[in-house]
Amino acid sequence: MIATILPSSTTFHAVDYNERKVSEGVAELLEMKGFDLIDQNYTPEELKQAFIDYTYQYNDRIQKPQFHLAISCRGNEYTHEQLLEIAHKYLDEMGYGDPNQPVLIYAHHDTDNNHLHIVTSRIAPDGHKIDHNQERIRSQEVINRIMGENQEQRASDAVKKALDYRFSTVNQFKSILESSGYECYEKDDRLCIKRDGHVINIAKCLIQSDITFE
């Protein structure tokens, strides 16, 4: 999972980029919030002006207030809806989670990798500039933390699903998980299940208790 912070802008040109992708049929607007006065038949210029009006209403001292981010995964590993959940967590942790914060989130279909583009303002609804110190470092830390939590949950779900299958040996159980992309290895009385650098452990006695004897 990669979160890429894209260039800032005075004029919110990221709106033009994403709306052009929509008009080309390779993107769609997944979420719009904080734009209560915008008619659904908006134009890109109206969206850009709404961002500019919002920003300079609360803080006119920031030269490049656009925050533009892309979140992408490998292939179809995550659906756009799952990426949207990750985006919400990311925005919260990076300081953009206020319910009145204007945000546009687009799903893109123009590459082999599912990805989202997020456009918002660096100005919070109370007028302060959202912290950008060590922004790229914090961004990577946040996405790693979110993905660590998510990978643990996915691995746990994969284990539960694998336990629903019929198997007669621990090796057969390992094969079920390996077919889903997990690396499995035994260590003492545990089975270690690894993917994308994240490892969960399960006691082998729990697996053995589910073994089906023919």
Question: Which stretches of residues belong to each language-model region?
Answer:
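N-terminal nicking endonuclease/strand-transfer module with a His-rich metal-binding environment
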Residues: 1-214
